[in-house]
């Protein structure tokens, strides 16, 4: 356990700061990431460098995105030219500009739990240029991300992310691994974007579709979780033949596999495109 926890810095609630201090957990995360010398490695919210230190023991240079101005200056003084510090909000950051042809762009971080879902959706915009992502998140969020249909955890977040990524729950992290300790358990998730075929289609287990249409469909489906889809998706009957596609509206939203939502969104998108033409 690290003794120089805050190094004079007071954790700020508005930034959702909980500093990782357990060396066993830290090295478990770094081993899961397995950084290589040729990687373009970017850490979101490095804080006091709990992950940055051991990562830089394995690679010569890396980059970070940090919002807290006090920490930005600390990081620049501490690591010098080995660390390129981007001062700003990861929610607004253009990660595409960090991509280098021929070098894997890898994103890692102990994400602030108060912005984790918006940040995950923001990062989807850059998935075509990202090799993989490893994030520490609230355990409940990770369970929702990797949830299977039919489980209570399965929902909008599960579907939207599983369409774009292969995901794996890597390890659990107890509150005592942080200072100050959060009130919830944490976990690390690995996210690998599905690659694309030469024609641009996603090489995933699910059909490709308009992600905006999918988001609208899934939001409507889960708007009343306790009711069957006949109540939440009936407004789409004039746009798609549910019976013809074998889509059973007698189910609840969490009982429908990801692929069926994607196929529904694809048909709706095709119909909208045909009408526009």
Curated annotation (Swiss-Prot):
Q: Name one GO molecular function term.
A: 16S rRNA (adenine(1518)-N(6)/adenine(1519)-N(6))-dimethyltransferase activity
The entry's localization annotation reads: Cytoplasm
> SMART domains given for it?
rADc
Claim: Translocase is one of the keywords in the record: no
Which cysteine pairs are joined by S-S bonds?
none
The domain of life for this entry's organism is Bacteria
Q: Where is the major localization of this protein? A: cytoplasm
Q: Which GO terms describe its cellular component?
A: cytosol
Q: Where does S-adenosyl-L-methionine bind?
A: 18, 20, 45, 66, 89, 110
Checking PROSITE patterns in the record gives: RRNA_A_DIMETH, SAM_RNA_A_N6_MT
Q: Which Pfam families has this protein been placed in?
A: RrnaAD
Please give the catalytic activity noted in the UniProt record: adenosine(1518)/adenosine(1519) in 16S rRNA + 4 S-adenosyl-L-methionine = N(6)-dimethyladenosine(1518)/N(6)-dimethyladenosine(1519) in 16S rRNA + 4 S-adenosyl-L-homocysteine + 4 H(+)
Enumerate the UniProt keywords alphabetically.
Cytoplasm, Methyltransferase, RNA-binding, rRNA processing, S-adenosyl-L-methionine, Transferase
- EC number(s) of the enzyme? 2.1.1.182
Top class in the EC scheme: transferase
Which range is the signal sequence, renumbered to this chain? none
To which protein family does this belong?
Answer: Belongs to the class I-like SAM-binding methyltransferase superfamily. rRNA adenine N(6)-methyltransferase family. RsmA subfamily.
Describe the function of this protein. Specifically dimethylates two adjacent adenosines (A1518 and A1519) in the loop of a conserved hairpin near the 3'-end of 16S rRNA in the 30S particle. May play a critical role in biogenesis of 30S subunits.
- Would you tell me the protein name for this molecule? Ribosomal RNA small subunit methyltransferase A
Please report the organism this UniProt entry assigns to the protein: Cupriavidus taiwanensis (strain DSM 17343 / BCRC 17206 / CCUG 44338 / CIP 107171 / LMG 19424 / R1) (Ralstonia taiwanensis (strain LMG 19424))
Question: What lineage, starting at the top, does this entry show?
Answer: Bacteria, Pseudomonadati, Pseudomonadota, Betaproteobacteria, Burkholderiales
């Amino acid at each position: 356990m690290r003794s120089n926890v805050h190094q004079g810095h007071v954790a700020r609630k508005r930034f959702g700061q909980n500093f990782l201090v357990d060396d066993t957990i830290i090295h478990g995360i770094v081993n899961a990431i397995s950084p290589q010398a040729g990687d373009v490695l970017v850490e979101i919210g490095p804080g006091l460098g709990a992950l940055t230190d051991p990562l830089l023991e394995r690679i010569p240079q890396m980059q970070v995105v940090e919002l807290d101005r006090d920490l930005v200056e600390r990081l620049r003084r501490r690591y010098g030219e080995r660390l390129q510090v981007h001062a700003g909000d990861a929610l607004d950051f253009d990660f595409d500009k960090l991509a280098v042809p021929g070098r894997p762009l890898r994103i890692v971080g102990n994400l602030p739990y108060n912005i984790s879902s918006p940040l995950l959706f923001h990062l989807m915009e850059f998935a075509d240029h990202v090799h993989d992502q490893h994030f520490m998140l609230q355990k409940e969020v990770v369970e929702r991300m990797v949830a299977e249909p039919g489980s209570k955890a399965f929902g909008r977040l599960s579907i939207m992310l599983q369409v774009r990524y292969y995901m794996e729950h890597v390890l659990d992290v107890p509150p005592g691994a942080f200072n100050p300790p959060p009130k919830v358990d944490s976990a690390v998730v690995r996210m690998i974007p599905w690659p694309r075929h030469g024609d641009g289609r996603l090489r995933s287990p699910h059909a490709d579709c308009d992600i905006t249409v999918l988001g609208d469909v899934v939001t409507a489906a889960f708007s009343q979780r306790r009711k069957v889809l006949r109540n939440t998706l009936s407004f789409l009957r004039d746009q798609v033949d549910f019976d013809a596609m074998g889509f059973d509206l007698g189910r609840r939203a969490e009982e429908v596999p990801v692929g069926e939502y994607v196929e529904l969104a694809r048909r709706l998108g095709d119909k909208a495109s045909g009408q526009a033409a």
